Swiss-Prot record:
ZnF (C4-type) ranges: 39-60
Highest taxon above the source species: Archaea
Name under which the protein is recorded: Large ribosomal subunit protein eL43
Gene3D superfamilies given in the database record: 2.20.25.30
Known function: Binds to the 23S rRNA.
PANTHER family assigned to the protein according to its UniProt record, in alphabetical order: 60S RIBOSOMAL PROTEIN L37A (PTHR48129), LARGE RIBOSOMAL SUBUNIT PROTEIN EL43 (PTHR48129:SF1)
Length: 80
């Protein structure tokens, strides 16, 4: 079998569709979304995403709001 996901990782499921740049960007965001993060309450690396902006620790059950793809979201200021 061919190695379809060498360049783009999990975005290989899209095949040749959508272009390589969009697939690489989607792959990076998807990896951030499914990664385990450190709980602010018990300090264990067991936090998973429940829904958009909702995160829950699988060890202590602590549920909190955060960013869409990572628990700690960044606020960017645009000067214009």
């Amino acid at each position: 079998m061919s190695k379809r996901t060498v360049k783009v990782g999990v975005a290989g499921r899209f095949g040749p569709r959508y272009g390589v740049t969009i697939r690489k960007e989607w792959s990076e965001i998807y990896k951030q979304k499914i990664a385990l993060y450190t709980c602010p309450s018990c300090k264990k690396k067991r936090v998973k995403r429940v829904a958009n902006g909702i995160w829950q620790c699988r060890h202590c059950g602590y549920k909190f709001a955060g960013g869409s793809y990572t628990p700690a979201y960044e606020i960017k200021v645009v000067e214009g």
